[in-house]
Amino acid sequence: MAQSFSMVLNSSFTSHPIFCKPQKLIIRGHNLLQGHRINSPIPCYASTSSTSVSQRKSANYQPNIWNYDYLQSLKLGYADAHYEDMAKKLQEEVRRIIKDDKAEIWTTLELIDDVKRLGLGYHFEKEIREVLNKFLSLNTCVHRSLDKTALCFRLLREYGSDVSADIFERFLDQNGNFKTSLVNNVKGMLSLYEASFLSYEGEQILDKANAFTSFHLKSIHEEDINNILLEQVNHALELPLHRRIHRLEARWYTESYSRRKDANWVLLEAAKLDFNMVQSTLQKDLQEMSRWWKGMGLAPKLSFSRDRLMECFFWTVGMAFEPKYSDLRKGLTKVTSLITTIDDIYDVHGTLEELELFTAIVESWDIKAMQVLPEYMKISFLALYNTVNELAYDALREQGHDILPYLTKAWSDMLKAFLQEAKWCREKHLPKFEHYLNNAWVSVSGVVILTHAYFLLNHNTTKEVLEALENYHALLKRPSIIFRLCNDLGTSTAELQRGEVANSILSCMHENDIGEESAHQHIHSLLNETWKKMNRDRFIHSPFPEPFVEIATNLARIAQCTYQTGDGHGAPDSIAKNRVKSLIIEPIVLNGDIY
């Protein structure tokens, strides 16, 4: 696969007889990175500004639905110190409950699950790990009930413990199948279903668990269980917990938990207040990014492209919602906004000649070379150049690391992959599935996003990590494959209407001589296998710090969410809009008597 990928990238350029002399890098007003030299030649084309308008495509993207004035009008209603004081008091009470030594250990385990799903887990990482370590030290993950055994397994794997799936063998019959007597235990079946998505490649018992629970949970009759449990089953069948983005799940679970008769009032109020306070932080970040995006002026200049600041910000919240990651969210919002704009240049507006030129100039990272670009590409290149250089300058100033070569390599590789897809489109060439995917997991932009994300985390960088980033370690590649396959499942119809032929669905159909439904099944199967590989990659032989591992996994989760019912990024429907509103715009109603 690595060889195929190299061949794809090497085939992305066309040789030209005339070249511009490489120049030294320049940063706006900074000379910190002077001395880096460019080895790649720049093809010198004649001006492309006279290209006929009729040669350019139009995607007819829907307009932006979140305008500047609306975003600036958000009130940040829970940023007051009064709420912060109340939140600290509630959190201390939750901490006391978690650390209660008199509580039965399995009761505490269920409490931890509620704490995590309510969105409070990040406040109690130390306490949660202490409880889970008790289960490891006592070797007591096996319980007589299926639901508690599965819950223990899931939580331990979520926190990186390589607990064996063999603990489920006691629930098998003499033929190696799950006992039919388990079917009536809906809570246990649901718990096993959720646990099965933490499986590694080759864990047959968890594959059996997934097939067994999926079949029987889908067969449940509404009258057989209570409404809350039915709601939980339907929610899980729609998308399992392990593949959901944390903050949207917290909103849903808080509202569901509030209807439970056994709900803990302290947990519930702590979760509601925390959600609203985090939401105010997100709104503040969003307003700052809205001002940045308006100041960039790209949207009115490049009217053919998608204006998707809110959707880009939503991606970053899905990757890292915690207040401490404000700088990371803002940096990634800039990156993803530029990716969206430049993607439309390649997909919709640029001629092949212009795209080859733009790709080569980005690879050179030469500010002087942009003079040969058409006007719409000049503003795009300069926006990219200034933004990436500014991020690199901040890292050099604050961390002492020169990260520019890693950032520009990721951008260059992505644009080469963009260019390959543009060639396939114009040639009406349908590549073989493997050839397509070797290019497409790079073109989907995951490596650019995650490379920036790593450096925005401000970690102490090691040589091993830098090599892993440069070589696109599995923790960059696996989320990118999931991102790509989800994207194709959600956008293939619109892409076909635009005349794009390179798509995993079409390649799969053509190569295997199968119909669209069978191709979708194949892609979903590949998605599941990639998740299994990533589950192991998360903690086995990973050189990356844990926060980055979680952010990389969250990239796959936000991709699943965005493309679950269509193209939630390029053509957001009412479902996508409501997700944004529930996560970023609309607070949860609090108990007025308390505050």
UniProtKB/Swiss-Prot annotation:
Tell me which residues bind Mg(2+) 2: 343, 347
**Any one GO molecular-function label of the UniProt entry:** tricyclene synthase activity
Requisite cofactors: Mg(2+); Mn(2+)
Q: Which UniProt keywords apply?
A: Chloroplast, Lyase, Magnesium, Manganese, Metal-binding, Plant defense, Plastid, Transit peptide
- Cellular component terms per the entry's GO annotation: chloroplast stroma
Q: Summarize the record's induction comment.
A: Accumulates in response to Tetranychus urticae (two-spotted spider mites) infection, and transiently after mechanical wounding and upon treatment with alamethicin (ALA), a potent fungal elicitor.
Report residues binding (2E)-geranyl diphosphate.
306, 343, 347, 484, 487
Q: Where in the cell is it found?
A: Plastid, Chloroplast stroma
Q: Name its pathway.
A: Secondary metabolite biosynthesis; terpenoid biosynthesis
Tell me what reaction this enzyme catalyses. Answer: (2E)-geranyl diphosphate = tricyclene + diphosphate; (2E)-geranyl diphosphate = (E)-beta-ocimene + diphosphate
What does the record say about how the cofactor binds?
Answer: Binds 3 Mg(2+) or Mn(2+) ions per subunit.
| GO process annotations (BP) | defense response; diterpenoid biosynthetic process; response to herbivore; response to wounding
Which residues of this UniProt protein bind Mg(2+) 1? 343, 347
The residues forming the transit peptide are: 1-45
Asked whether the UniProt record includes Plastid among its keywords, one would answer yes
Q: Tell me the residue numbers annotated for binding Mg(2+) 3.
A: 487, 491, 495
Task: Report the EC number(s), separated by commas if there are several.
Answer: 4.2.3.105, 4.2.3.106
Tell me, in one coarse class, where this protein mainly resides.
plastid
Query: What residue intervals hold the motif DDXXD motif?
Result: 343-347
Record note on domains:
The Asp-Asp-Xaa-Xaa-Asp/Glu (DDXXD/E) motif is important for the catalytic activity, presumably through binding to Mg(2+).
Described function: Promotes the emission of terpenes volatile organic compounds (VOC) in response to damage mediated by arthropod herbivores (e.g. Tetranychus urticae), probably to attract natural enemies of the herbivores.
Describe the family membership recorded for this protein in Swiss-Prot or TrEMBL. Answer: Belongs to the terpene synthase family. Tpsb subfamily.
Q: What is this protein called?
A: Tricyclene synthase EBOS, chloroplastic
Q: Which organism is it from?
A: Lotus japonicus (Lotus corniculatus var. japonicus)
Point out the gene that encodes the protein: EBOS
